[in-house]
């Protein structure tokens, strides 16, 4: 028993007396162990955080995939609805779509036609060529601009027409019955014109005046103010106090206006203002084309008042009236190539003119083959009509008569004057028959314009047309079509076409066949041209 206790005591003593350094080492080891445990715990926590982040990322990815799937489903549904609508639209006969399609087709046709007219006048000649015509087309398939001959209406002189009462503006007014105008043609029942509105409408053609040659700065207000002032200055306001002008319409492109007066008498007084200066430019004052003297005679005075003070506005008394009145002469059947100066010279063989107007096409500026004139000495009116009527001028026959009534016979005391005038006309006729004697050269006018010749492609088309058509009638030696100079310098003969043949037989056939044919909407004028002038390249000789 003593051994057991003794042994146990030794152990206790040995533990109690263990060195202090061993204790410190053990505590340090325990501390490190705890630190390692803490680091492990932190690592585990970090792993859990990363796992949670990865989980959230996976959830967001799944959400994005779901959104994409939903978008794809929506796109697929829209695509299917679109195709279903298109199929239904095709299958359903919708009237609106048909109308819209027809409108589109008509619009495309108009655009095609406008493009053709702009690019090539050959389309207006009904030549049947495509817009981009190939040069390789055979001649047998090519349609010439000369295929159609002139209509009878196009070669006859245009005479003024007198409308019937049914054609009067007032006759178509609502509330008016046909039996309200039981009078003969050219007469008006004044009882029908009682209401002011109907009177205004029925007299409008006699209350309007044409004013041409306006400056570019002119407008409706300035024209109205000016004519109100000058009408008051000359004493032309015969309808009472106030402005004479009711309305003004201006065509700025062509520089003319229609001025509507408040009364027929004031419109006639305004005719005395022909040649007056408006903003420094002399203007023409004329009756409009719908004016008819026979109908206007029942509505009021057709001549300006003799009491007008024209000197107040710088006009010479005695020039009033211009081309109006019963002594106005119609001159028809003039050769198209006659210039204004040539026609004037012919008419003035009977005396000085008070008024003269060679009627021209507004678009081309070419003569329409007729004119109007009034002589200062009205006594020579019948003499001139009798002397000039029926005279041959080239291949034309003149028709000369009073414009507003049938031809009157000259009085006995005028017979000697008439005989002398006829002899003078016969001499002048020889002067104006240039182109009557056959030559090898034919000159065509009213075929082309300067603008058309500026375009190279159009020029070649016209040249080819001329060669093909002119070659049908004989041995064609040369075709000359003068063109405008790019610098703007004057070039002789622009607007004419010259055809030179090997002999007179060919040129005669060509002149006969081509004269009066339609080319570009105009009747072609074909005359012989002096060979010496053609050889000298003088293309401005009268032809």
Curated annotation (Swiss-Prot):
Domain RRM: 207-290, 327-405, 446-532
Biased composition (Basic and acidic residues): 17-78, 88-114
Short name of any one Pfam family annotated for the protein: RRM_1
Keyword Repressor: no
Subcellular localization(s) per the UniProt record: Nucleus
A biological-process GO annotation: spliceosomal complex assembly
Disordered: annotated segments: 1-171
InterPro entries from the UniProt entry: Nucleotide-bd_a/b_plait_sf, RBD_domain_sf, RRM_dom, U2AF_lg
GO CC aspect terms: commitment complex; nuclear speck; U2-type prespliceosome; U2AF complex
Molecular function GO labels: poly-pyrimidine tract binding; pre-mRNA 3'-splice site binding
UniProt entry keywords in alphabetical sequence: mRNA processing, mRNA splicing, Nucleus, Repeat, RNA-binding
Disulfides per UniProt: none
Record-annotated membrane-spanning stretches: none
Biased composition (Gly residues): 1-10
Compositional bias (Basic residues): 115-126
Presence of keyword Hydrolase: no
Record-linked NCBIfam families: U2AF_lg (TIGR01642)
Family: Belongs to the splicing factor SR family.
Role of this protein: Necessary for the splicing of pre-mRNA.
Domains: entry comment: N-terminal RS domain has a very strong bias in favor of D over S.
Listed name of the protein: Splicing factor U2af large subunit B
Organism: Triticum aestivum
């Amino acid at each position: 028993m003593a051994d057991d206790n003794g042994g146990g005591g030794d152990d206790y003593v040995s533990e109690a007396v263990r060195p202090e350094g061993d204790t410190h080492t053990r505590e340090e080891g325990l501390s490190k162990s705890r630190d390692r445990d803490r680091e492990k715990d932190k690592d585990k926590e970090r792993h859990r955080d990363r796992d949670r982040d990865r989980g959230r990322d996976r959830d967001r990815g799944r959400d994005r995939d779901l959104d994409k799937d939903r978008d794809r489903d929506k796109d697929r549904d829209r695509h299917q609805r679109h195709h279903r609508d298109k199929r239904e639209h095709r299958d359903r006969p919708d009237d609106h779509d048909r109308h819209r399609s027809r409108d589109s087709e008509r619009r495309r046709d108009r655009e095609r036609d406008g493009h053709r007219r702009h690019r090539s006048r050959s389309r207006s000649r009904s030549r049947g060529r495509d817009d981009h015509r190939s040069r390789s087309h055979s001649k047998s398939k090519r349609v010439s601009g000369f295929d159609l001959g002139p209509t009878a209406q196009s070669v006859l002189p245009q005479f003024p027409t007198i409308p019937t009462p049914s054609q009067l503006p007032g006759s178509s007014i609502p509330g008016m019955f046909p039996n309200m105008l039981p009078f003969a043609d050219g007469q008006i029942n004044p009882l029908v014109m009682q209401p002011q509105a109907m009177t205004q409408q029925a007299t409008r053609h006699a209350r309007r005046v044409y004013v041409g040659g306006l400056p570019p700065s002119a407008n409706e207000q300035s024209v109205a103010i000016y004519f109100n002032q000058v009408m008051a200055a000359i004493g032309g306001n015969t309808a009472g106090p106030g402005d004479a002008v009711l309305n003004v319409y201006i065509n700025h492109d062509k520089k003319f206006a229609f001025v509507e007066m408040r009364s027929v008498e004031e419109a006639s007084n305004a005719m005395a203002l022909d040649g007056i200066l408006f903003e420094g430019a002399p203007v023409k004052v004329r009756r409009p084309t719908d004016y008819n003297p026979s109908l206007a005679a029942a509505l009021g005075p057709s001549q300006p008042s003799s009491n007008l003070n024209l000197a107040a506005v710088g006009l010479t008394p005695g020039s009033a009236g211009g081309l109006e009145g019963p002594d106005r002469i119609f001159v028809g059947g003039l050769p198209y190539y006659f210039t204004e100066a040539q026609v004037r010279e012919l008419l003035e063989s009977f005396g000085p003119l008070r008024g003269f107007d060679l009627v021209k096409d507004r678009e081309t500026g070419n003569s329409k083959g007729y004119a109007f004139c009034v002589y200062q000495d009205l006594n020579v009116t019948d003499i001139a009509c009798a002397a000039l009527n029926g005279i041959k001028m080239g291949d034309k026959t003149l028709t000369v008569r009073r414009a507003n009534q049938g031809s009157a016979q000259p009085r006995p005391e005028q017979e000697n004057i008439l005989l002398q005038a006829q002899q003078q006309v016969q001499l002048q006729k020889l002067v104006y028959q240039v182109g009557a004697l056959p030559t090898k050269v034919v000159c065509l006018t009213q075929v082309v314009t300067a603008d058309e010749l500026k375009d190279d492609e159009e020029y070649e088309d016209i040249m080819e047309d001329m060669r093909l058509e002119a070659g049908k009638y004989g041995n064609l030696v040369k075709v000359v079509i003068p063109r405008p100079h790019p610098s703007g310098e004057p070039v002789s003969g622009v607007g004419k076409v010259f055809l030179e043949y090997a002999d007179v037989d060919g040129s005669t056939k060509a002149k006969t066949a081509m004269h009066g044919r339609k080319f570009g909407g105009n009747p072609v004028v074909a005359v012989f041209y002096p060979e010496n002038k053609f050889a000298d390249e003088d293309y401005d000789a009268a032809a």
